[in-house]
Amino acid sequence: MNLLLDEIARATARLADAGAASPRADAEELAAAVHRVRRSELHGVPDSAFDARFWEFVARREAGEPLQHITGRAFFRYLELKVGPGVFVPRPETEVMVGWALETLRDMDVRDPLVVDLGTGSAAIALSIALEAPRARVHAVEKDPTAFVHATRNIEELDERGRVRLHLDDFAAALPELDGTVDLVVSNPPYIPMSEWEYVPPDVRDHDPADALWGGGDDGLDAIRVVERTARRLLRPGGYAAVEHSDLQGNGVYWIFAEEHGWRDVRNRRDLANRDRFVTARLAAD
């Protein structure tokens, strides 16, 4: 065992004692970030190249700082995104919704589909769609100035073809010039009710921006209600919406769409763990 792998083993034990959910993966990712290699390349780092900053990173993770804030990067589908304090860290669960969105775009008989991402955060969803559906034109909306800076940086670095346009605006008022023309609206809005505050992991509630977590209203679904109204305004007849929610809110979000006139094919869809994760709906064509 080389020095770095030995130190990773020690760090894993420390992070496990601190209550980290995935201590080995965290230790490896911290080591990879410090040494600027992939996790699969850690075994090749020579003893002479060991960087003692690794232990500074481990101490920060022990104290509850999010892994992605320490490393400054988050992985989402095929992207490596720049993240940090003030922007929501994208989660793997959201990747399933993006996969559905891409399949839906492929099935549309539209040459250059128009997509809107409401509450883009780091621009993970917007960039994934733009890069994996190269003909898509994507408008990403973010109201928080700090998150907007992160999104701008990621778009400038990754969107070489200029398919994503970023807008600093609120969900409700966004993009009136596109009313009735959009093919697909996607959103991972805030949806946690404040009554769940004590159950949210500290490294989430103390570090992710509040506006990206707490959805408003007793059920946490007020932001999703705004997304539904905005999607109904933006979409063309026959266009689709996809909105993420927690695994306990599927029924509530289903009825937000099903009870409104104009929506068809409302469905709750599951993530890779077979839990309710996002609702999709089609705006009626008549």
Predicted regions and their residues:
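Conserved beta-strand segments of alpha/beta enzyme cores
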Residues: E80, R137, R163-R165, R264-R267
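Conserved Class I SAM-dependent methyltransferase catalytic core
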Residues: G217-R282
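Conserved AdoMet
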Residues: E29-T104
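Non-catalytic accessory regions of SAM-dependent methyltransferases
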Residues: M1-L42
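Residue-level signal for inorganic ion chemistry
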Residues: L30, G64, T94, I125, ...
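Flexible, glycine-/basic-rich loop-and-beta segments that form/coincide
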Residues: A285-D286
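Conserved SAM/SAH cofactor-binding pocket of Class I
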Residues: V96-Y199, V226, A258
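Mobile active-site "lid"/loop adjacent to the S-adenosyl-L-methionine
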Residues: Y191-A223
